[in-house]
């Protein structure tokens, strides 16, 4: 099922099967348990971790099934397409508009990779473990959970299930720097699972990083 703002699109309107409302205050949602239901034989999922919406209001969702790393839904919950890049544990998903063309960044902590694709699933760039950082002895140390991308194309990777570093690359995948790491200090993390870029102050953007514990 999906929770959606009661005033958003057609989702949450004319729901005959449920009157369940979640949330509180001004943020209340009706649950449509039939939204997004698909044939599990044609579109196996296993687990899903993240969704993003493109400029056409389509929803892209990662799954951990190697047959369908990404499922594409329209606003009505119908599947418009699916594709795979061969990942077994697709996790974090970020969408970025680069000059009018949109791209996805997918992390796979089990495959120890980050992949940039177009919206049709064509691989543009892959990043494996950062050999430039001495704490990483092998790919097994690198288990990325999320990415965010700056307006200039710089890529920030949160290694949330690995060494807990935030690793910065340029748009071509060249290593720039890293910071953080696991620990109890104010500049360290313990499972830096999520990361995004706050650009509300255009001249002073900030990284927002969630540390689970």
Spell out what each predicted region is.
Residues 61-62, 106, 157-158, 209:
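Residue position within the beta-strands of beta-propeller blades
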Residues 68-70, 112-115, 124, 164-166:
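Structural signal for beta-propeller blades
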Residues 33-41, 78-84, 125, 131-137, ...:
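A short beta-strand motif characteristic of beta-propeller blades
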Residues 14, 32-68:
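Beta-strand-rich domains and repeat architectures in extracellular enzymes and scaffolds
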Residues 1-10:
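N-terminal export signals
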Residues 9-34:
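Blade/loop signatures of beta-propeller domains
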Residues 64-65, 109, 160-162, 200, ...:
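Short loop/turn segments immediately following the C-termini of beta-strands
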Residues 42-56, 86-102, 132-154, 184-206, ...:
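Beta-rich, blade/repeat-based domains predominating
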